[in-house]
Every structure is written in structure tokens, then in C-alpha cells.
A protein has these predicted regions:
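N-terminal, positively charged nucleic-acid-binding surface of large information/translation enzymes
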Residues: 1-93
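Structured secondary-structure scaffolds
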Residues: 4, 12-13, 64-176
């Protein structure tokens, strides 16, 4: 099944997942100051830049300060490392498993999952704050389960527990 992230069934899944995560206390509101690439719609750390430029657009990111919502990804760092080490076939081939483990040795930062509507007008509105939309890379990753009818769909129940993904190496870090 092919799905677009603009479809209502996808929006319903994203809204549900966001609300579930928010209700569990895994999403918080905070101010962020950092380097922002307009072309990527993404914040970068200094260490991710190439000669001070966005690695994709080769342009200097803008330093901005704004309030957004964040997913407590840092809380899952040790669990992820343990899971990958205890399940060697979880990421294959080995070189990419090692790459992900190397990435996870650095402090895992919480993930900014929103953009203010005042700056970005398109996107799925956060169910707990109508002034914000979901960051595209957070909602796009959920299309794997929304296409399968998450959470009750028969296709989801059949395929997701044993799913295997083939991920291009240039988006490995985003998926990891």
C-alpha cells in the first residue's frame, strides 16, 4: 500500500501517536537556540556542518531562537544500545549496526518535533497545541505504520511484528 503523508488516515495515526506520547510525559515544551537550515527545515549541531555549511544545501544556517516541542529521545539511549547489542540482526549489515552504535555513543539529544505555524504553515497540527505543526521527519517516519492501518488494522497486526526495512545509507541516522 502506498500512502502520502497528506492523507487523512496518516494524519489520524500521527495525531494519535503524538497524543499518546504527550500523555506519557515524553514530550515537553522548551526554548531552543541553534543553527537552522531553511532548505532542510532542520536544526543542526556545529559538528554536523561541513566547513560551517549545511551538508546538503552548502549554505550557512541561520542562528535562531524559538520555542518548540521536544521528544525525550535521550531517555531511550541506553535501551537502544542494549537492544541493538542483544539483537545483532536488528540492524544489518554489521557495518551499519556499528555505525548506529557509534552514533549512540555520543549523548543522544532530545528531538525537536514541532515547528511554529507562524513560521511553517503546512504540516499536521499538534493535537495538544494548535499553534504548532509536526516536524516533517517525525511524522514521515510514522507512515510505515499508518500505511498498515496502525494500531488495529489487520495488515498492521500481520506485518509489523516481523517487519524488515531496507533503509538507504544516506538516511540511516534519521531512521536510527
Amino acid at each position: 500500500d502506498f500512502i502520502r503523508t497528506t492523507e487523512e488516515r496518516h494524519k489520524r495515526v500521527v495525531t494519535r501517536v503524538l497524543q499518546d506520547i504527550y500523555d506519557k510525559g515524553e514530550i515537553y515544551y522548551s526554548e531552543y537556540e541553534g543553527l537552522y537550515c531553511v532548505g532542510c527545515e532542520r536544526f543542526y549541531q556545529e559538528r554536523e556542518l561541513v566547513d560551517g555549511l549545511c551538508p546538503d544545501h552548502k549554505k550557512e544556517p541561520k542562528r535562531i531562537k524559538e520555542s518548540n516541542y521536544f521528544f525525550r529521545m535521550s531517555a531511550y539511549q541506553n535501551w537502544l544500545i542494549d537492544h541493538i547489542n542483544q539483537n545483532p540482526d536488528f540492524i544489518r549489515p554489521k557495518q551499519y549496526r556499528n555505525e548506529v552504535l557509534s552514533f549512540l555513543k555520543e549523548p543522544l539529544e532530545d528531538l525537536c518535533i514541532s515547528r511554529p505555524k507562524s513560521r511553517l504553515t503546512w504540516g499536521i497540527t499538534l493535537p495538544f497545541d494548535e499553534n504548532y505543526v509536526t516536524y516533517v521527519w517525525f511524522d514521515a517516519l510514522l507512515n510505515y505504520v499508518s500505511a498498515l492501518g496502525y494500531p488495529e488494522g489487520e495488515t498492521y497486526q500481520t506485518f509489523w511484528p516481523s517487519v524488515q526495512h531496507i533503509i538507504a545509507k544516506d538516511i540511516l541516522k534519521t531512521h536510527a
